[in-house]
Amino acid sequence: MTQGFFISFEGGEGAGKSTQIRRLADRLKAAGHDVIVTREPGGSPGAEAIRELLVNGAADRWSPVTESLLMYAARRDHIERVIRPGLARGAVVLCDRFADSTRAYQGAGGDAPASLIAALEEHVLGGTVPVLTLILDLPAEVGLQRAEARGGAARFESKGLAFHERLRAGYLEIARREPDRCVVIDADAELDAVTAAISDVVVQRLGL
């Protein structure tokens, strides 16, 4: 059986990842592909339980190190129960956030040691990494305004503009270091333009 494709979507709060994932999923399904849409933290029952601990409560509820450990506990369950089985059956797995979110949120944003995050990646991911990562980029203040207007994961939104500016810089640095995997998409553009840009990249990179 043909191995599937693992595509992750990354970006700060209010970047529009969920909308763009849904649009890409609809296009791929219409073309006859088996598509799994999932998210992190979460995606499996165990990981969703951990998600509740992570996204609710005060901004300082967890330290960056503790957050990283919780994220990776959820991620491992998600990989074992959803991502790997999906890829094994040949599906296109579209994931709203993956390991780069830990690098950006807990690393660049929260100062968790890079050595800790690297060790977690090595031992937990076990080679399960996206073949393509789409980083939806926009100014931090614009993203926060969008997120506030829609409601949502208030714990991370409440961390303040400086945190989210570090977060954005962290994502752009990931893209700079890993251009073969990562593509930056201008998420401050019109909705349809963002969709078209994503579709173009997926066609060019993966032929989907």
UniProtKB/Swiss-Prot annotation:
Molecular-function GO terms, alphabetical: ATP binding; dTMP kinase activity
Entry keyword annotation includes Coiled coil: no
Residue positions binding ATP: G11, G12, E13, G14, A15, G16, K17, S18
Keyword annotations of the record: ATP-binding, Kinase, Nucleotide biosynthesis, Nucleotide-binding, Transferase
PROSITE patterns according to UniProt: THYMIDYLATE_KINASE (PS01331)
Family the UniProt entry places it in: Belongs to the thymidylate kinase family.
Known role: Phosphorylation of dTMP to form dTDP in both de novo and salvage pathways of dTTP synthesis.
Name the UniProt record assigns to this protein: Thymidylate kinase
Species this chain originates from: Caulobacter vibrioides (strain ATCC 19089 / CIP 103742 / CB 15)
Upper classification of the organism: Bacteria, Pseudomonadati, Pseudomonadota, Alphaproteobacteria, Caulobacterales
